[in-house]
C-alpha cells in the first residue's frame, strides 16, 4: 500500500514502506509541521490567486501558520485554497489599493472571510474542511483593527 498525504502535504507512510529512506521523509514531514505551527510567508495576490499544496514538499504557502497578503490590487481580489485544507491561520492584509480581499475554498457555497476595501488588518481564521463540497471559513472576530477586552474572571491563581 502506498503512502497517503494530509491536506497540508505531510506524508503518512504505511508500515514497511520506505525502508532505508524513511529518515528523509520524516525530516520533510517535520519541516512541514514546523511551518504549520509557526511559519510566516508573504504571498503576492492579484485579482484571483489560487494557493495549493504539493504532497511531501516544504514551502507551500498554505502550510504556514501566518500568511501576509501583499501586492497592489487594481480590482477586488480572491484567494482560494483546496477543499481538504484544515488549518488555523493568522492572515494579514498587507495589500495596497482600495479593493476587497476574500479568502475562501476553491469551490462550494461555504462561508468565506473578507476584508473591506479599507480594512488592512489581521484576522484569525479557521479553515474547517468540514464538508466535502461546501466547507466553511470561520472568522474568529479577533482582528488587529478592533478593540478587545481580555476576560480573566475564570482564571484562578
Q: Where in the sequence are the language-model features?
A:
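Exposed extracellular interaction/assembly regions and N-terminal maturation sites
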Residues: 1-101, 149-154
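Short, surface-exposed terminal/edge motifs of secreted or surface/virion proteins that either
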Residues: 30-39, 97-106, 111, 124-143
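Extracellular disulfide-bonded cysteine-rich modules/repeats
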Residues: 25, 120-129, 154
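Extracellular interaction modules
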Residues: 18-24, 119-121, 133
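Glycine/proline-rich low-complexity spacer/linker segments in large multi-domain proteins
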Residues: 141-151
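A short, surface-exposed interaction/processing loop segment used at functional sites
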Residues: 113-117
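Tight coil/turn sites that cap or link beta-strands
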Residues: 84-86, 118-122
Amino acid at each position: 500500500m502506498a503512502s497517503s498525504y494530509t491536506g497540508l502535504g505531510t506524508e503518512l507512510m504505511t508500515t514497511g514502506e520506505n525502508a532505508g529512506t524513511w529518515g528523509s521523509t520524516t525530516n520533510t514531514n517535520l519541516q512541514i509541521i514546523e511551518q504549520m505551527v509557526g511559519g510566516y510567508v508573504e504571498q503576492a495576490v492579484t485579482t484571483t490567486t489560487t494557493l495549493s499544496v504539493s504532497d511531501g514538499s516544504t514551502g507551500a504557502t498554505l502550510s504556514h501558520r501566518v500568511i501576509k497578503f501583499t501586492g497592489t490590487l487594481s480590482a477586488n481580489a480572491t484567494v482560494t485554497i483546496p477543499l481538504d485544507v484544515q488549518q488555523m491561520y493568522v492572515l494579514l492584509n498587507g495589500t495596497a489599493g482600495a479593493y476587497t480581499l476574500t479568502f475562501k475554498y476553491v469551490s462550494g457555497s461555504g462561508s468565506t472571510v473578507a476584508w473591506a476595501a479599507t480594512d488592512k488588518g489581521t484576522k484569525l481564521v479557521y479553515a474547517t474542511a468540514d464538508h466535502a463540497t461546501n466547507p466553511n471559513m470561520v472568522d474568529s472576530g479577533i482582528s488587529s483593527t478592533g478593540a478587545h477586552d481580555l476576560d480573566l474572571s475564570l482564571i484562578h491563581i
